């Protein structure tokens, strides 16, 4: 079998630029590790100690116990809600991700009761719903490790009433179960009010004796409403729901026992469907991935050849480039990552009409062949100016945006630099429903750069004031705008609000993409109607 050409690196490890890049990336990676370590502590040492004193496993220990030994866990949005709510909700108070349980990829959603009793802040809801979206798109069983006091009542107006609020969790459970996607719950602590529907709407539910409780109204509410005095265990404990109400199906003695039962349930599930594409044995890149730190500038404004990234991410550093001589500010081609076939779309400069047409053509090819797409974003936008507008750059850009929106194959996006304006759309930003989207720590995302925004707004202001506006006044006007864009475009600002699925170390890019592709392979590709096949690939 003929193999694709091997990419070589032109970057010089002895150069000053390499050394500067490497040092900057190391500093960013250290900051990322520090932030992640803080988030993983949940509610802090005192809350963790109280949790353990009750005989419970810590939330992350629960996840580790559930997973197959030694298998990886692809965590989703581990820094969600960072800096929000006065810092009261690390990781948004819930752990979510994809892991292997009894040999099967599953989505795991585990409440962290060390964070405000596992109650749901607005970002907790958003993260839980995002995990369910991942499960639905990739047809992955959902495993809920429940230990939650329900909605965070002081913010009920941002948690309860709207379409994408708390109630959507149970809607999603019903719809996924109806679609044959297993829903399994283990009640390891409180399961209160609306949250009681998590186990009640699961296909199978486990509860821990003298620890798990399920009730729509807790003892204080029952007393206030009816005058009845009852303990939590008498009202909705494991014995009640396993022997009397039938809300749960399995009674466990402790967390470890409950998690073993969940593993056994997963082991009984039917085998997943055949893989939607051929997967070959993985091959490590021939160009050392550790060189990503040195080869890639931290500042997205500094030009470099994006093939330096591709060579360090794909199997064997092999890359069959498509249309290499045309539209050269967009690199497209075929490769494999952890054995999975991928079509890569990577920015190598600003987008011109030719680049956009090339991108649209390539995306259509991948759709036709059932090949997942990987977008490597580092884009300041489309070229502007009279000649380019007259040349139809808007309609050519629209072709690529349409192709991105309409393709049937899985899309995975990594923001490795800037993500600005319409370039974000053409390169499969969040609005274009990539199966997954991650950002590097150096990444930036905004409608435009801070300097450009400040200049645009300053021009409008100057036109209003005329000669009365001095250079000092202009700078005083522009400085806070630049600062605002710098803050709001930061990767950590973005990930705290779940604009992505997490900030990742560049050196983890290959592994993260491989795990995500494995998850994507659980879902069949939508089939075209051969009786009405529609259009073939248009040569743009």
Regions found by a protein language model. Give the residues of each.
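Ligand-binding clefts of soluble mixed alpha/beta catalytic domains
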Residues: 1-540
